[in-house]
Amino acid sequence: MATPSPLRALVPDHEIRFNAVLDHWTGVGDFHAAGYRQATELLLQRFLADPEGTAGERDSLVLPILFLFRHYLELRFKDIIVYGQVLSGQPARWRHGHDLESLWTEVQELCNAVYGSSVSAEFVKVGECVTDLCQLDPNSTSFRYPRDTNGCPIFEHLVIGLKALNATVASIGDCLDDISMDMSVRVHDQP
């Protein structure tokens, strides 16, 4: 009887189409942020495409979806901050920590320095979304764990509208991705 091989999750497949590649260029913040946004949207679109067939999954997967979206915002903010620092003549420093409110404050300051007062209505909605998310998950733990550090349940009853969440992810994601792309181009066009 042959011994079973150990389960190995991180080995390449012999068929290239079943492999994902992480390379030196994946160290740029945009790559990570884009992946978290895409994962958020794929899960939401799955539920919206088949609301009857995914009823039980919606409740069990909404927390990972919210975590993915929150983490997208965190990574995109950090990405914009680095570009904004360079464009403002500051040294580029990648921020650590998960405080969306302080990251958002810095994004606003740097966007005002780069663009002046010409911010879109969507940009204002980002701040409203950050406020909502931070009320539910101020430290990036509430969407990941069932209980807080005192052992108390984090959510007793919360209803999340998936259509509204999907529209928010798309709208805010487009706004932030556009800012990141514009700043990236400006940084790369500098002499």
What is each PLM-predicted segment?
Residues 1-191:
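Domain-scale activation on soluble regions of proteins
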